[in-house]
C-alpha cells in the first residue's frame, strides 16, 4: 500500500477517543479530502504490519505512546505517507508544503507528532531497526529482573532512536527536510509567547492557558501556517470528557478554532444544547410543568 496520499494515525482503544480529538481529525478531512485517513488500533494493525515486525512484548511492556512511536517508524518505512498524531489540527491548506515535500523524510524540528515519508525511507528503516533492538533489550533485562529505569524515558522508542538518524542525514536534502516548528507555528503557544515578548512560564501551564483557559482563536487564525500540534497528555481531563457540543460552547481558543475553520454554527449548537438541558430538567422534575 505505497501511497503518499494516506494519513496514518493510532489510537487504542478506538472506542475511547475523546470527542475533541475527533474534531482534530475532522480538520484533516476538511482541508485534504483527497487523502485517505487510516486509524490504526489493535484490531487492524496486523493488516498493515507483517507478523513479526516487532516482538509481541512491544504491546505488553510499553505504554501506548511508546507503542505508537514504534508503529509509526514501521508504517512509514513499509508504506510511506503522512503520520499525524490524533491531536493534530489542520488549520488551512497552507500545510500542503509539508504534505507534498519531496524529501524521503520530513519533520518539524524533531517533533515526531507530524511526519512525512516515502516508502523505504532510510531514516525510517534505521529507526525501525533500532526500535526492534531496543524492544528486545528491554525484554531481556526485564526477564532477568534487571534495572529498567534507564528504559523508562518517554523518548525510548521515539526521538531516542530517531535523533541520531536525523543528525546523520541532516545535510542530505534528498533524505530529510527539517522544518522549524516555531517559524512554521505548529507549536502556537510557543509562537504566542514570543510575540508577547514573554518567554517565561511552564510549558504545560502555557499550553493549558493558551488553548483551554482563554480565547486566542483570532490570534491563531491570523498567524497560522496550516497546522497545530496539541499535547493531549497535557489537556485538562475535564475537557477530554466533554461531548462535541459541550466542548464547542466552552469559548476557548480550541473551540473557537474548530467553530471557525469547520464553519460550524455556534448559535444552533447552543440552542440545541439549551433545549436538551431543559428537557433533562423536566425529566428530573416532572411536577414542575404539570398544570
Residue ranges and their predicted role:
Residues 69-81:
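Small-residue hinge/turn detector
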Amino acid at each position: 500500500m505505497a501511497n503518499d496520499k494516506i494519513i496514518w494515525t493510532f489510537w487504542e482503544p478506538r472506542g475511547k477517543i475523546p470527542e475533541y480529538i475527533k474534531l482534530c481529525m475532522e480538520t484533516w478531512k476538511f482541508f485534504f479530502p483527497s487523502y485517505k485517513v487510516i486509524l490504526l488500533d489493535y484490531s487492524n494493525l496486523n493488516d498493515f504490519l507483517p507478523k513479526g515486525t516487532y516482538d509481541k512484548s512491544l504491546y505488553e511492556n510499553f505504554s501506548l505512546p511508546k507503542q505508537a512511536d514504534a508503529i509509526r517508524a514501521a508504517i512509514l518505512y513499509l508504506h510511506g505517507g503522512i503520520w499525524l498524531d490524533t491531536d493534530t489540527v489542520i488549520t488551512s491548506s497552507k500545510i500542503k508544503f509539508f504534505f507534498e515535500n519531496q524529501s524521503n523524510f520530513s519533520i518539524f524540528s524533531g517533533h515526531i507528532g507530524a511526519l512525512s515519508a516515502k516508502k523505504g525511507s532510510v531514516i525510517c528503516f534505521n529507526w525501525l531497526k533500532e526500535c526492534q533492538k531496543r524492544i528486545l533489550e528491554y525484554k531481556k533485562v526485564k526477564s532477568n529482573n534487571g534495572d529498567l529505569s534507564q528504559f523508562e524515558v518517554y523518548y525510548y522508542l521515539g526521538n531516542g532512536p530517531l535523533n541520531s538518524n536525523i543528525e546523520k542525514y541532516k545535510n542530505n536534502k534528498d533524505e530529510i527536510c527539517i522544518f522549524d516548528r516555531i517559524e512554521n507555528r505548529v507549536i502556537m503557544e510557543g509562537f504566542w509567547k514570543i510575540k508577547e515578548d514573554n518567554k517565561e512560564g511552564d510549558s504545560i501551564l502555557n499550553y493549558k492557558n493558551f488553548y483551554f483557559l482563554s480565547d486566542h482563536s483570532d490570534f491563531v487564525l491570523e498567524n497560522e501556517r496550516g497546522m497545530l500540534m496539541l499535547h493531549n497528555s497535557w489537556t485538562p481531563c475535564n475537557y477530554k470528557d466533554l461531548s462535541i457540543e459541550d466542548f464547542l460552547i466552552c469559548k476557548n481558543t480550541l473551540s473557537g478554532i474548530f467553530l471557525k475553520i469547520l464553519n460550524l454554527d455556534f448559535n444552533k449548537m447552543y440552542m440545541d444544547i439549551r433545549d436538551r438541558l431543559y428537557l433533562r430538567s423536566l425529566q428530573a422534575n416532572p411536577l414542575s410543568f404539570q398544570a
